[in-house]
Structures are given as C-alpha cells and as structure tokens.
C-alpha cells in the first residue's frame, strides 16, 4: 500500500510512497561466514573515506580512549542506513570485524555473517526501510527507531510483513566503530534470542488477505504492536454520501456512479480501494460512505457530481490506529473490533478520538469471507515516536 514514517531526518525507500529499520528482521538460521562468504556485491569497501571521517572525530586504533563525538556517528547513521538495501550498501568499515548482532530470531557474531544476512533479505524479501530517528542514549551507545516493510516473494500471494522497533548500537571506544547491534521489535514482549514469540509474529503475517492491485490512499507505518498498527495518512479526496450504518452499503451505488461517469463532464475515474464508511461519534451518530479518488486528481479540476447528495471532500492527513481482520464485516463485528481497539489504545496511554472508520478492500459478494481484508481505523489525538 503505502508509505512509511515521518521525521526531520528521514530515509525512505518504500513500496507505497508507499510509505514503508535500522536493522531488519531475518527469517534465516544464521549461516557461518566461513561456509558462505559475503558476495562481492555487499563487500564494497569505503575504508579510505570512512577512515578520514573517523580521524576527524577522534577515532584511533590505539589502546587509549579517543575523544569521542558520538553526535557525528549519529549523523553518519542518517547518511549510511538509507543504503541498507540499495546497490551501494552500508559502509562495512564502520563496524568491527567481530560485531554482535541480535534480533529476536537471528544471531551473528561477525560482520561477514551480518552482511550476508542483509544480502539474503534483499534478494528474497525486497525490503523497504525507513529510519525515523537516531540519537545518543549512552556514553558509547546510539539508539535508532525504524520501520521495515518486507514482501515475501516466495509465496504466490506475496504477503507484506511489517516490523517496527528500535536498535541499540554499541560503540567500541578504542576504534569508534560499531561493535554491537541489538534489535527490539514493538510487536512482541520477549525480544531475547531465540524468541518463539518472534517466530510466531513472523508466521502470522504470512496469511493471505485479498488486496486488489489498484490504488489506495498513501500512508506511512509508524508503529506496529501485537494488537494494532499506527499509520500516518497523507491527505486525499473522496466522493461521499450519507450511509445507513457503519457496515452497510446504502449509498455505495450513488458514489460509485460518480466515478463511472455520473458527473458534469461524464468523466470516468479509476476505482480505488478501500471503500470507507465513517461513523461520527457513537452508534447513533451520522454515517458517511466514501470512495477515495486517485491521488493525481485535484479538487479544483474535478467534475461536479450529478447527484446533489454526492459531495466532494478533502480529507486531511491524520494519524490513525488500525486493526485488520477477515470475515464478513457485520455491524456487531465492526463495533466489537472498535471496542477492542479502543481498549488497547487506552491501555498503551494513547488518546483515541470519537468515531471510527471501516475500510473494506473487497467486494463481499464475490470474495471468500476468510480472505476478505477489512480494517477498523480510529484517529489518534496525539502520537509521537519519541514516547
């Protein structure tokens, strides 16, 4: 779908703008580098420029501690990590030869194993990486926050896996190189290697949801927990009319008619997904049904609707919490999902606003219930990745 995240210093390679981690989750048993040396494609050597940089900030191979400017290493990460999965690759000379890497299901103790793992992920998962921030969190420690989107290319339906979290990177004070890299996922509690909870988190993301291959509103994934996802949506335009209930379809033919040519210029406009129904306030509040218009469309150039009850509306960008589910989106199911989501958000100290949206990505009349993709979205009053 989409995009990934938002930051004053940000790196983004995303399949959805999407959207869209410092280090990445891996789904392979660690392979000793002695048997599988890293391919040349990921052995790019930038030692000369990196050595000059290190000398500039006081790094040395001597046994005495150098004068450390960790802030410059933070700046280096902002420059280097965007290349995690491109042809340039990360600067391997920034890491000790013996570097400890660990995430909940992967473990390496050398730069060779670490780089080979990155290579495998690049080939099989086509990852999209976004660094939200990096900052010093200890005398010889930098913490980063990231989002990682991965498309598992070996399965026919190519599921998208989403991971968010932090990486704690330890610095060798003698060399000013990174000597450890420990990943912590937001979606699990047990982040120690080997975490069966982490493995299950991977497996459950492999399930099949039928998502049409058409345009969707652009968003960034800021955080994914065990119970919900936090997204930042870009602004978009909808054609909307009054609906009957959150799970209802009343009014759909009216808004669909607009994009099929029932407008002042008889223009046919491309269909998008999902179809939104929006409830304002509690169950007794008003309901609107909306079709999102393609991102290339501008409000000033759109044709007027033929039907007076159809309205064109600009929707401001927003940060929302989202829960995904399959099956038929009946009113009881949708309200139950909304209630559960509010409970999880409040338990995590977030402030959900009144009202919610139901996003339906498929035609329920022509799609098997167990592969339907439905989502409930609730706007968040305030959200910060610094919290």
Write out the residue ranges for each language-model feature.
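C-terminal and inter-domain tail/linker signature
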Residues: 2-208
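A solvent-exposed interaction/effector surface
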Residues: 193, 197, 201-387
């Amino acid at each position: 779908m989409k995009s990934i995240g938002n930051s004053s210093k940000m790196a983004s390679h995303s399949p959805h703008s999407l959207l869209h981690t410092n280090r990445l989750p891996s789904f392979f048993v660690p392979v000793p580098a002695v048997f599988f040396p890293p391919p040349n494609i990921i052995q790019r050597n930038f030692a000369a420029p990196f050595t000059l940089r290190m000398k500039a900030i006081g790094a040395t191979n001597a046994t005495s501690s150098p004068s450390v400017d960790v802030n410059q290493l933070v700046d280096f990460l902002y420059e280097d990590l965007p290349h995690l999965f491109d042809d340039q690759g990360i600067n391997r000379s920034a890491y000790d030869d013996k570097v400890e890497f660990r995430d909940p299901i992967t473990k390496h103790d050398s730069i060779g194993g670490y780089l080979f793992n990155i290579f495998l992920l690049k080939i099989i998962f086509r990852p999209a990486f976004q660094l939200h921030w990096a900052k010093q969190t200890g005398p010889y420690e930098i913490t980063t926050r990231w989002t990682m989107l991965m498309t598992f290319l070996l399965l026919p339906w190519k599921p998208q896996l989403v991971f968010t979290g932090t990486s704690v990177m330890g610095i060798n004070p003698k060399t000013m190189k990174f000597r450890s890299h420990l990943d912590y996922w937001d979606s699990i509690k047990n982040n120690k290697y080997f975490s069966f909870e982490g493995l299950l988190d991977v497996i459950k993301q492999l399930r099949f949801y039928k998502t049409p291959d058409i345009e969707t509103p652009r968003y960034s994934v800021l955080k994914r927990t065990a119970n919900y996802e936090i997204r930042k949506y870009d602004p978009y335009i909808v054609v909307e009319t009054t609906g009957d209930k959150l799970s209802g379809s009343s009014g759909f033919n009216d808004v669909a008619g607009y994009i099929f040519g029932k407008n002042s210029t008889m223009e046919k406009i491309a269909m998008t997904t999902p179809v939104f129904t929006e409830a304002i306030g509690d169950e007794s509040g008003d309901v609107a049904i909306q079709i999102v218009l393609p991102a290339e469309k501008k409000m000033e150039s759109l044709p007027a609707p033929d039907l007076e009850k159809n309205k064109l509306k600009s929707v401001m960008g927003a940060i929302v919490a989202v829960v995904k589910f399959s099956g038929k989106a009946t009113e009881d199911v949708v309200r139950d999902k909304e209630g559960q989501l509010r409970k999880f958000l409040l338990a995590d100290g977030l402030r959900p606003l009144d009202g919610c949206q139901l996003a339906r990505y498929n035609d329920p009349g022509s799609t098997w219930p167990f592969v339907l993709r439905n989502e409930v979205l609730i706007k968040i009053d305030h959200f910060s990745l610094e919290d």
